[in-house]
């Protein structure tokens, strides 16, 4: 799922570091954050509900929060979401109850995070999943049977050089996710067909992002209606 964590964002929190200075200035105006929330939320199911619905790939974007003294890491999409720790524990609870299920967690955007923040996040991942974490290896050698035999259930993709320091972090290049960046369904389908046919035959997984992306004029036209009412087909 896309922006998998964004079923809840906190409109009372500061605007996230993933936003431009212009958006941050606008957010000081009353009601602007309520409008932002309509465009930040891309899911209406919790992690648990998404898992129960069959989702096994999660697109995750994370950030530190200004003024947060304990170095907690939060999910982010314009506005701050829940703590990463809480989301990971919710996922682990499902996996413990379903020992043959395997999931992909794709940490692909990091904001306002220094080395200490990354270490904190990686520690949270270890604490949540422990021996369920599958070490990085050849994609071709990985089968469900192998995962079941070794009781591995979680593949973590980490789009940051810190992956090199931990055997259970897979490099981001192992799961490319080409992005169409369009509001046109026709262009999106053509893009998906093209990138699928051009994907690497070996050595990596592949994500087909079947999503429409609003442009500035899209948001301006559907400002009050929000993302779901404007782009969901």
Language-model features and meaning:
Residues 136-233:
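Surface-exposed substrate-engagement region within the catalytic domains
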Residues 76-133, 152-154:
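Intrinsically disordered, low-complexity acidic segments that are enriched in bulky aromatics
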Residues 62-65, 107-110, 161:
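An acidic- and aromatic-residue-enriched active-site/binding cleft used to recognize and process polar
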Residues 56-60, 103-107, 154-158, 206-208:
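Structural recognition of the beta-strand scaffold that forms the well-ordered cores
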Residues 55-56, 131:
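Short aromatic/hydrophobic-glycine micro-motifs
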Residues 1-53, 66-98, 102, 162-172, ...:
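Long, acidic (Asp/Glu-rich), low-complexity accessory segments flanking structured domains
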Residues 47-48, 91-92, 122, 126, ...:
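Short amphipathic alpha-helical segments and helix-helix/interface helices
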